[in-house]
């Protein structure tokens, strides 16, 4: 049947006799409650908005293909990497972090970089960003980050004071803040930025040998960024600039590609590493742990319906496949709970049945038979009348011990250990990053910082200047000048780092 031949029905299939005129008591009388189509349409409309993501609410997505280009089977027995040339269907979602669904794409912000690979061993979600580090390394601070970068509870406006008060209370945040204030703080669009798994993960091979890894995704389109002025001009005319760019590029066959790399660290190297190798505020230097090519992914198909595929896409780092595993990274450990929990709230307990989230390489009849019922259980007949318990005398649903992971290394007693006693090397890496910038790029960091700190109180500005100075004196002096603060009025060599536990006024 053509679109032109289709006739209007209600959601349960009943013919609709009149789409434009409500049922009333007389031509000018009140509406009748028996106008079923009107009631149905309004009640459906009243409920069609689902909760937005607490972070990463504004997003764009596309389907694509991952292809293995290099052999890494000595590190992992994950089937997705089993042979050169192997292809796996995937879905990618990119996002801003702080803004709501209607936020502008060209804001200065971190970009989410979430990938879902539909492998024959289940879905693998790699939930990353366009930066290799994060603002802090303990997940107990995550809720406060959300509060600081979003709207003030009194004014309901984004508040730079809240934002910078939080960031400058965490000296370890300077690395991420430096990236955010640099040229890469505003990618021109989603195609012209790198992506990172950010966390440390692990791989293991057929012999049960484990290595620690970090994932990198380098754009094949090249890096392109926007200045504050360019971004403001774009936002004034197109708040969906990045989404539009990605969609239109794919529609015309200009498919964007990224190359996947890993960095590898042995367990012995991790024991002797200068810093905590699982610290999300730090990178592994490439000269010590070089990038190893793995493959590439291409995005080549736009979703047919944004809500169905992009808004309902659910990513969680707990979705991991044999051959890959987690690490002691505290932030990763915290996300193992929070992401799945948030998706169950936002989309429901059976959100895995939504097509974009369904495991495509595993038959639906093989999905866990012990997870049953719940709202909107629709696609698998709720496992019918089959066995729903274990053990059972039918020999059904036995465990698969061949997929057991190698023992996970841990040490120490359970305790709330002070992270600052373990590692207070906050400023080495942001200092090195600053020194890698060209002179023009450094000046833009100073200017961008001053723009972002407009309206922030002097005590918070001074804390930030002090942290910048500790990373590199030129960094501190440049920020102070841009902020119009005499650097000689600041105690630059105080021994007490200004953390949320120990502010110096």
From Swiss-Prot:
Official protein name in the record: Catalase
Cofactor(s) this protein requires: heme
Active site location: 56, 129
Family: Belongs to the catalase family.
Gene Ontology annotations for the cellular component aspect, listed alphabetically: cytoplasm
Transmembrane segments: none
Annotated region described as Disordered, given as residue ranges: 1-25
Keyword Nuclease: no
Pfam family, one: Catalase-rel
Known partners and oligomeric status: Homodimer.
EC identifiers of the protein: 1.11.1.6
Biological role stated in the UniProt entry: Decomposes hydrogen peroxide into water and oxygen; serves to protect cells from the toxic effects of hydrogen peroxide.
Organism from which the protein derives: Staphylococcus aureus
GO molecular function: catalase activity; heme binding; metal ion binding
Catalytic activity field: 2 H2O2 = O2 + 2 H2O
Residues annotated for heme binding in this entry: 339
Coiled coil stretches, renumbered: none
């Amino acid at each position: 049947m053509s679109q032109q031949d289709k006739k209007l029905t209600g959601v349960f299939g009943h013919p609709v006799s009149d789409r434009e005129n409500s049922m009333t008591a007389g031509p000018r009388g009140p509406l009748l409650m028996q106008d079923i189509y009107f009631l149905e349409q309004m009640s459906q409309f009243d409920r069609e908005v689902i909760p937005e993501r607490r972070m990463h609410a504004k997003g764009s997505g596309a389907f694509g293909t991952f292809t293995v280009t290099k052999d890494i089977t000595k590190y992992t027995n994950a089937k997705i990497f089993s042979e050169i040339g192997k292809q796996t269907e995937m879905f990618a979602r990119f996002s801003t972090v702080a803004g709501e669904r209607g936020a502008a794409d060209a804001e200065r912000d971190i970009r989410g970089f979430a990938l879902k690979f539909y492998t024959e061993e289940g879905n693998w979600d790699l939930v990353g960003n366009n930066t290799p580090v994060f603002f802090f390394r303990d997940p107990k601070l995550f809720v406060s980050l959300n509060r600081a970068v979003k709207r003030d509870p009194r004014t309901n406006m984004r508040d730079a004071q809240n934002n910078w008060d939080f960031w400058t209370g965490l000296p370890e945040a300077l690395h991420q803040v430096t990236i955010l204030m640099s040229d890469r703080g505003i990618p021109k669009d989603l195609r012209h930025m790198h992506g990172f798994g950010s966390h440390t993960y692990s791989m293991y091979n057929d012999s049960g040998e484990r290595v620690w890894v970090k994932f990198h995704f380098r754009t094949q389109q090249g890096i392109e960024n926007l200045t504050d002025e360019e971004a403001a001009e774009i936002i004034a005319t197109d708040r969906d600039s990045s989404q539009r760019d990605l969609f239109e590029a794919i529609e015309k066959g200009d498919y964007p590609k990224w190359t996947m790399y890993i960095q590898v660290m042995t367990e012995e190297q991790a024991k002797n590493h200068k810093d905590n190798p699982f610290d999300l505020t730090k990178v592994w230097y490439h000269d010590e742990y070089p990038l190893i090519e793995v493959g590439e992914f291409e995005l080549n198909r736009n979703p047919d319906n944004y809500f169905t595929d992009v808004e309902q896409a659910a990513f969680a780092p707990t979705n991991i496949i044999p051959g890959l595993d987690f690490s002691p990274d505290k932030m990763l450990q915290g996300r193992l709970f929070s992401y799945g929990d948030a998706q169950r709230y936002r989309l429901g307990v059976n959100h895995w049945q939504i097509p974009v989230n369904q495991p495509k390489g595993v038959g639906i009849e093989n999905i866990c038979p012990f997870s049953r019922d719940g709202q909107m259980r629709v696609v698998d007949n709720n496992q019918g009348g089959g066995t729903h318990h274990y053990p059972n005398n039918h020999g059904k649903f036995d465990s698969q011990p061949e997929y057991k992971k190698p023992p996970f290394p841990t040490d120490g007693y359970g305790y709330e250990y002070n992270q600052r006693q373990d590692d207070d090397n906050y400023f080495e890496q942001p200092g090195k990053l600053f020194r890698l910038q060209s002179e023009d790029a450094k000046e833009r960091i100073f200017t961008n910082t001053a723009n972002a700190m407009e309206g922030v109180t002097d005590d918070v500005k001074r804390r930030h200047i002090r942290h910048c100075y500790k990373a590199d004196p030129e960094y501190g002096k440049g920020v102070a000048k841009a902020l119009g603060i005499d650097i000689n009025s600041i105690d630059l060599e105080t021994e007490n780092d200004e953390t949320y536990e120990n502010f110096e006024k």
